[in-house]
Every structure is written in structure tokens, then in C-alpha cells.
Amino acid sequence: MTDILSPLAYLCGKPTAKAKLKALPEHFQVNEVLGYSLTGHGEHLMVRIRKTGENTSFVANELAKACGVPSRAVSWAGLKDRHAVTEQWLSVHLPNGETPDFSAFLAQYPSIEILEVTRHDKKLRPGDLQGNEFVVTLSEVSDVAAVLSRLETVAELGVPNYFGSQRFGRHGNNLSEARRWGRDNVRSRNQNQRSLYLSAARSWIFNQIVSKRIEQGCFARFIEGDIALAEQQMFNVDGDLALWDQRLQAGEVAISAALAGDNALPTSGQALPLEQAELDAEPDLMALIRGNRMRHDRRAIALKAQNLSWQVQEDQITLRFSLDAGSFATSLVRELIEEIPVVRHYDQGHEQESRDSESED
């Protein structure tokens, strides 16, 4: 099956090396980092789990059963990939202060471990996630030297901050449904479904804008009318572009692209027609976005991994790095290798569909 992101431009050209990603769950390890400390008291039981080959929503549902509460009483800061070993916090609303016996739950699911239990005065929400720490192993690498050369470039320049294929659902189904909803003016009270489709719509258009900037040679430099980001503030780029580029190289500002909304683009000059063309190319997605009154936002077009390092052992390369919340490790890997398809065999004892892949953001 063709990757939904395959038409998008590569910063350094399509990789020549091939390798397997997530050949084993332990080849993709994720450690969640919250943006604050837990209080140790409050109405919410905080459970830090390590899961192998399971997705977040499945574990949350089973944890809710173990605690004797409805699924809506369990929340998280971010979804984690199924095909991985991941650590994250789940919060369970248990206002009476009780701590359930998890022994039966753990015996039923040896793929799930409980690492820590404490309490907090607020439930977990998606905005609570500061970022993730990754340990990613590329196996059966066809050309180790080529990957190492690219790693040097990635460490210096970063990679396109694409939303990963996980954002668009299995086989791109979320994106297909987003287009259908926009085309047919579908109205639904299913907030979760609507959120998934809106997210897919905005993410797709953002990716197209970033790809176009690479094609036009303005990924790593400002153009007239850009919007710069700096510490959650936005600035109109005008005046001497060379000075803006100096600030970009110094890491003081970032080039941004549109997360489309129902209001007008804030860009001008050269940047406005570049972005507007990609919005106009997706009338069904824009109909969905406008119909739901989404407000325009911005996202940096470049992704730079923090604390990036790597080790080589024969035909395996192990990467260690951290990413801020909302960024995709698979977007970094995409610049390094062409993935060799991996056939996975999972226990079919309970529903695979409900346990399929999720994003690392």
C-alpha cells in the first residue's frame, strides 16, 4: 500500500537507504513528559503505565473497567502508538480517594505494566503534554553510511514538520471522511469523530503548504509576507529579509504555515498566494473547516529534534531524541530511510481494530 505522505517533498531528496521501522515493539520506545509536577493529592488517581503492542484508548478502556468507572472517567495527555513500547500517564476520576486492586487487570494483560500510582487535583488533558522522549531502532539498514550522512544534515537543519500518516487514520480514512463531510455538509453530534476529521483536514493542508515551500526553495528562508513564530507569539515579516533569516539561523524565530480556519489568512506579499493556493485546492476540506468555525492558527514548518544522538551496531542504527508535543517522530525518520514493510502478527484474542495504531504526538 502506498504511503499517504509519499507525494510530499523531502528536504534532502528521497532517501536512498532502506530499513525497517518498528520491526519489534521495543524498536520504538516512547517516554511521555508532562509539562508540570503532580500534586500527590486530589480527586484524580494518576497511573503511569508501560504498554507493549497496545494503544492508549484500549488500555484506558480496560483500566476504567478495572477501576469500576465509565470510560469517560479516564483521560490522557497524548495518544501513543500501538506498535511500540510506551510510557505515559492516565488519570482516573476517583474522588473518594480509593486505590483499586490492579492485580487481576495486570494478570489479564501482561503487555501492560503499572510503574507508578499517585494523585493529582486535575484530570489530564491533551494540552498537558510537554513532549516525548524517543529511542528508535532502524533495523536491516541497507546503507548505514547514507543514513549517518543524513543524520548530520538533520541535526543541523531539522526536517519538515509534517503531520504523520497516523493523523489521517487507517488507509487515510479520516481524510476521506473529512472530504465527504465537507462535500455533503454532514452535521454530527459525535464530537470525537468531528474532531478527528477536522484535525485531518487542517493537517493535510498544512503538509501541502510545507511541501510547496520545499519545492519552491523557501523552506529555510523567509519570504515577503511570512508569519514568524517566537515563544507562542506571531510577527509579520517585513523589512530586511536577511535580518529575519539571521534570526532564523540563531533559533530566535521560526517560519510558520497555516492551520486553516474560517477567517482570512494573515500572510501577505509572496506568502499569501503560496498558502491560499493550497487552501483553494481542497474545497471540500475547507467547507468542513469553515462550517465548523475553526479559527486560523500557525505551526512551525521545521522540526528540530532535541538531544539527537545515534549508535550503530552492524546493520542497526539506534536514535535517541526528544520532540515537543504535536511533533511526529515518523516525520524525522522519513528523511532518513525508505521503510521496508513489516508484517506484524498480534494476538487475535480480542479486537484488533480497537487496538490499532495511534499517533506519537
From Swiss-Prot:
Enzyme Commission (EC) number: 5.4.99.27
GO molecular function, one term: pseudouridine synthase activity
GO biological process assignments: pseudouridine synthesis; tRNA pseudouridine synthesis
Keyword Amino-acid biosynthesis: no
GO cellular component: cytosol
Reaction(s) catalysed (UniProt annotation): uridine(13) in tRNA = pseudouridine(13) in tRNA
Pfam families: TruD
SUPFAM superfamilies, per the entry: Pseudouridine synthase (SSF55120)
TRUD domain sequence ranges: 158-303
Keywords: Isomerase, tRNA processing
Active site: D81
Entry similarity comment: Belongs to the pseudouridine synthase TruD family.
Function: Responsible for synthesis of pseudouridine from uracil-13 in transfer RNAs.
Protein name in the entry: tRNA pseudouridine synthase D
Organism in which the protein naturally occurs: Vibrio cholerae serotype O1 (strain ATCC 39315 / El Tor Inaba N16961)
Record gene name: truD
